[in-house]
Design a protein with these regions (language model features):
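N-terminal glycine-rich anion-binding loop in soluble enzyme alpha/beta folds
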Residues: 2-78
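Active-site pocket-lining segments that scaffold enzyme catalytic pockets across diverse folds
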Residues: 78-101
Length: 101
């Protein structure tokens, strides 16, 4: 027998983290995802279940340099920078017992 709590009761809430970028993507549009989810009411939809929602806003990473792919990779240094930013933001929320979305 374990003393593990259900996940929902172990969490302090959820945190919305926007990463508005389409760097590295073959098609444009992914950068609009965070705004679209907010306009669609993701925070309200989650909070109606009694879950605390923290909107952390959008991360601010490097701009798209609009260059051709090199060896099959699009904007690799910028993609790495975005991933590091997102990693740090997710780690901070997990460290605060929050589920990052």
């Amino acid at each position: 027998m374990t003393d593990a709590k259900p996940l929902a009761s172990a969490l302090a809430g959820v945190s919305l983290i926007g990463a508005p970028t389409d760097i590295g993507a073959g098609m444009l549009g992914a950068r609009m995802g965070p705004a679209a989810l907010r306009v669609a009411g993701i925070a309200q939809a989650v909070s109606q279940f009694g879950i605390d929602v923290r909107d952390c806003g959008n991360l601010d990473g490097p701009a798209n340099p609009w260059q051709d792919a090199v060896d099959g990779f699009r904007h690799l240094p910028e993609v790495v920078a975005w991933n590091r930013l997102l990693h740090d933001a997710v780690f901070a929320e997990l460290s605060d017992a929050r589920l990052p979305i």
